[in-house]
Swiss-Prot record:
HAMAP family hit by this protein: Ribosomal_uL22_B
Keywords associated with the record: Ribonucleoprotein, Ribosomal protein, RNA-binding, rRNA-binding
Organism: Salmonella arizonae (strain ATCC BAA-731 / CDC346-86 / RSK2980)
A Pfam family it matches: Ribosomal_L22
Family listed: Belongs to the universal ribosomal protein uL22 family.
Protein's name in the database: Large ribosomal subunit protein uL22
Amino acid sequence: METLAQHRHARSSAQKVRLVADLIRGKKVSQALDILTYTNKKAAVLVKKVLESAIANAEHNDGADIDDLKVTKIFVDEGPSMKRIMPRAKGRADRILKRTSHITVVVSDR
């Protein structure tokens, strides 16, 4: 049984979150949690939270055994960007893009 959890509009760029997502794709859930715990990146905290939510969903909604779960799919899509302005010299301005991402984790007992 596949179970899904999402975090939409996570305040980190998709490029940075994908670095962490690639570390746990295809791993057993317990091993993935260990990897995320000791990964020194902000995105690791975000992905760990989504993974824990997917585990809880599998246990509560599907009655799955946590020891059998694997991270079958994990993907990170770009979310909407917030546009901000940074003042520059001589009355000019630069645009700053505060990027967001949508993190999706799918766990399965197969």
